[in-house]
Amino acid sequence: MAVATGLARLPVVCNQRLAELLRQVDDVDLLWLEEIHEEAARMFGSHYSDQPELMPKTPSQKNRKRRKRPSALRGESLELGRRRLSRRRTNNLKAVSSKRDSQRLQNKEDTEGLGTEAQELSSQTVSRRLTRSQVAAPADRSEVLPEHLRERVVPVVEISVCDRISAEFQFQKCASERAENHSASLPPSSDDKSPKESSAAESQPLPAASELIVPHTPEAKGAGKNKSAFKKTANVADTTVVLSEKELGLEEVDDSAQVQKHNERDDKEPSQRTTDSPETPTGSRLSRRSVRRSLMGKPSTIRRTSLAEKYSLARKRESTIRKSIARTVIKRKAPQKLSVSSSSVNGSGSEEVPEDEETVVNAGPPPVPQTPPKLDFQGLRMSLRSQTVNRNEQQQETSNNECDLSKSEKTQEPPQSARRKTSYKRAVDQRYDTQQAEDGGLSPLRKKTPSPPCPASKVVRPFKTFLHTVEKNQLLMTPSSVGRNGVIKSFIKYNTPLQHDPKEKERQKLQALRKKEEAEQLRKQKVEEEKKRRQEEAKLRREERLRKVLQARERAEQLEEERKRRIEQKLALFDEKTEKAREERLAEEKIKKRAAAKKMEEAEARRRQDEEARKQKALQQEEEERRHKELMQKKKEEEQERARKIAEQRQAEQEREKQLAAEREQERKKEQERKKEEERIQAEKQREQQEKAARLQKEVLAAKEQLQKEMEKKEKEEQLLAEMKRQEQEQKKLPEEQKAKDVAQTQHLENKENSPACNSYQMTPQYHKDPKPPKINPNNYGMDLNSDDSTDDESQPRKPIPAWASGNQLSQAVIRQYYNPPNVDALFGTIVSPKLEDIFYKSKPRYFKRTSSAVWNSPPFPGAKSVLGLPYSLKKY
């Protein structure tokens, strides 16, 4: 079942995907292709003389506008008459075309979410995405323009700040009266035209058909229903108010006109000041803005126009053409304006529309038979700079219009005490939005919701200082023909309107028209002068560039000539050096050739001399060889004779030697027998001597022992006697006893050191000599500090020899063994040296090295020898 459902839905899903794909291709891919095609066509149609349109400006080419904050200008209001308006502010304003505004606001309209009825309205107009050129093209606009707009009739709605606020109040009080006024001022079609409409259309020579799209709030539905005579749809929640760019500028003109009218009223009666009230309504909380806001800080929610439209030279030329055409139209319309100015003001200025109202008013261009058809439906664009130049002219005319407007509204509006005055922040917001629309728009106009009605008792007028600041902002941001010493007038408007005489009103209109014509002539003169000045500057710049190019070319030629000259100098110097080197080389070669020839001659002479010397030497050698051969022959003969004689003598000698050998053999045998006998006799004598010596030694030992015993007895007796004497004289002679004791101790030490026991042995070398007194070093008191027992002097051992080593037989055996050493290898065999690693199970590198800390070469006394003799000083003989 699920498979069947999936198969049934498959065509629907495929159709949806295909529709999405086709929509994406139409909206994105084809749009890009069309735009690329248009840009390519424009590029190939410009004869390659225009600058690239799609290339952005570098940061150095961008001329960003820098405005002062309104709060910063408040403190400078008193210095405005003395200060000069900045030319940079007027010169840096870029020309913003009406087509750019319409495209920007159309893009905003495309991005807004519309309801169901708004979608129906958008389906009647353009619904698909457009390229930048299509949005800018006037052909698309001609499709939705009504027929009466193409036939010279231009319905105009002029909306000022005060009119908008009064209209909000009137919507709630007298909707029916306002509806009648709307229908009277704006006819529904072109069939029932009135003189007011034609005069209003003629009094507004709009050079460009631009549209300003303002979103609407639901509070203006009633007003939209009353305007069904010139609307396409009636019950739409979100529609647009389409105003011309010229009309946006006229809002400020109306403000300035009202300022002039109120200032005239201020001259007649004193101004009234009111205090602040905490109950003053200030409108919606969302629509309020701070006065201290940055003009550049608001994020823009609209899309920028393309760089091709912004920086195109073709568009600049188009704008210049449209400006000139607009001037000619103004000249032609001037007499007509003079005749129908009053009716045009009543028809165009009596309309009061709030800012958020849904109204569609399209401003078409005036009929110009000389312009091509493209300019008819596209409209003539005028830059902001040209509009701001003419703004002073429009202020005079709109001031007169305001006078008639106030008189006509007096019959249908309640007294002005019941009208709401614009609040502090709403006035700032309105002026900021107007300036943004004129400057090309850093951000879109914010949505305004009308404030709730408020009784006149709660309305608080703004301070005069704030109004001064607003007027100053207008003067600073709008370049006009205001003099340097112009006086800032008050914005304060009283509740009671002035009553104007119709003749005075007509006179003022004529005067305003005359001033406007004079200002137009002055502006044209200034434009011509500026044009001439720019042409002169361009000519000077061109001449300067040509001069610089010529200078650079001359400089390059000079550098090239200088370089060639240096190269020629280098080549000449190189040739000169080469020639000099070649001459030097030839001279050296000649000298070398002469030296070589001389050497060859000398070598030839030496060779001849050597040849002669070799010949002489060869002759001498031959003579010497001949003489040597003769001598050798003689010597050989003498040798033979001498050898014969020697052989004879040797033979006789051999015979004699044989006889002598026999005799010597006999004598040797006799000598051997005699030696054997002598050895036997000598051995017997020696044995007898040893026995005798042993007997004598025993006797000597016995005598020594007996003598020693007697000496010990005597010593004991002497000691007893000495002890007794010492005890008797102990009390009397203590110092003498101490001295004697010291002397005895010293003598005892000397006896010990000089004891004959060390030198009294038979084997000692000093046996028959007197002992030498030891040499005592006073620094170490005779002590050998660098030695131990192993370094005792063997000639004078410090330890006594034991009794077992002092026997006569032992000494004789030692002497015999010393002179006749036994063959140890024959007696005991080869003794292998022990391996200490195997015995101690350790391996040390210093087993077979002497590791004693003693200094073996240091003698005990300074006069002793470092190398000792044989042990016991025994010498071989």
From Swiss-Prot:
Record's compositionally biased regions (Basic and acidic residues): 98-111, 261-271, 500-548, 572-591, 598-615, 624-695, 707-742
Biological process, per Gene Ontology: chromosome segregation; meiotic spindle midzone assembly; metaphase chromosome alignment; mitotic cytokinesis
Compositionally biased tracts (Basic residues): 62-71
Cellular component GO terms, alphabetical: chromosome passenger complex; chromosome, centromeric region; cytoplasm; kinetochore; meiotic spindle midzone; microtubule; midbody; nucleus
InterPro entries with a match to the protein in the record: INCENP_N, Inner_centromere_prot_ARK-bd
Subcellular location(s) of the protein: Nucleus; Chromosome, Centromere; Chromosome; Cytoplasm, Cytoskeleton, Spindle
Outcome of swapping residue 840 to A: Interacts with AURKB but fails to fully activate AURKB
Short name of any one Pfam family annotated for the protein: INCENP_N
Domain note: The IN box mediates interaction with AURKB and AURKC. The SAH (single alpha-helix) region is characterized by a high content of charged residues which are predicted to stabilize the alpha-helical structure by ionic bonds. It can refold after extension suggesting an in vivo force-dependent function. The isolated SAH domain is monomeric.
Function: Component of the chromosomal passenger complex (CPC), a complex that acts as a key regulator of mitosis. The CPC complex has essential functions at the centromere in ensuring correct chromosome alignment and segregation and is required for chromatin-induced microtubule stabilization and spindle assembly. Acts as a scaffold regulating CPC localization and activity.
Protein name: Inner centromere protein
Organism, as annotated: Gallus gallus
